[in-house]
Amino acid sequence: MAGQRRESSWKPIVDAVAAYHRHNGHGPTVKEIAYVVGRSRTAVRFQLDKLIEDGIITHTPGKIRTIRVVE
């Protein structure tokens, strides 16, 4: 059950990143992700850090619009 709860918290973020990249050719900002999923930038940043740690998404530190889902 904890895994399901965890997936329900990060799945919308992964979906938003993938959709944004597909439509725009580059990654979204944290602010844009937060707007789409209806969460604070702090909450999104926390989830992004976990997703990066788990290898689900990647980004280039210090550069904007490099967040993307690992294929």
Feature roles, as predicted:
Residues 19-25:
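Short helix-capping/hinge SLiMs at alpha-helix to coil transitions
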Residues 12-19:
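Pre-recognition alpha-helix immediately N-terminal to the DNA-recognition helix
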Residues 52-62:
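A short, conserved structural fragment
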Residues 4-10, 29, 60-71:
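Short, cationic-aromatic polyanion-contact patches
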Residues 27-36:
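A short alpha-helical element within helix-turn-helix/winged-helix DNA-binding domains
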Residues 42:
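Key DNA-contact positions within bacterial/archaeal DNA-binding proteins
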